[in-house]
């Protein structure tokens, strides 16, 4: 993980899991995190219309140029949605750094498969390291493994494990 990202994530810990995930996604300067930024909608590697830091959905307006403030608002809304989708399934106390890493992961891949995942099962069994190691399995898009996703998952795993230290 780049030292600047490590420092920014450490500074965000007091803000909670959503703040941690936001810094992971946007990076210290707002465009150098795990997600790139595009103010103009584009199709991602699996053909989904995407804008800003990875926002997807029917509310994307093709042809519109989004502002930095609009992108921040979309990210905050999306991370709050991720939190609502997964928090009810986590039955044990986990560190905020782990929760932030999970929010980042599920912002990227969607929360659908989380409910039946080995990742969640390991969390609820109290196997924090085993759960964090599961992040390495979420590296496929469109049936293909991607180096960029492998790198991202290693960074998320590192943050996930911070609560162990």
Swiss-Prot record:
This is SAR-endolysin. The gene is R. Its main location: host cell. Signal peptide: none annotated. GO terms for molecular function: lysozyme activity. It is an enzyme of class 3 (hydrolase). It catalyses: Hydrolysis of (1->4)-beta-linkages between N-acetylmuramic acid and N-acetyl-D-glucosamine residues in a peptidoglycan and between N-acetyl-D-glucosamine residues in chitodextrins. The lineage of its organism: Viruses, Duplodnaviria, Heunggongvirae, Uroviricota, Caudoviricetes. InterPro entries: Bacteriophage_GH24, Endolysin_T4_type, Glyco_hydro_24, Lysozyme-like_dom_sf, Lysozyme_dom_sf, SAR_endolysin-like.
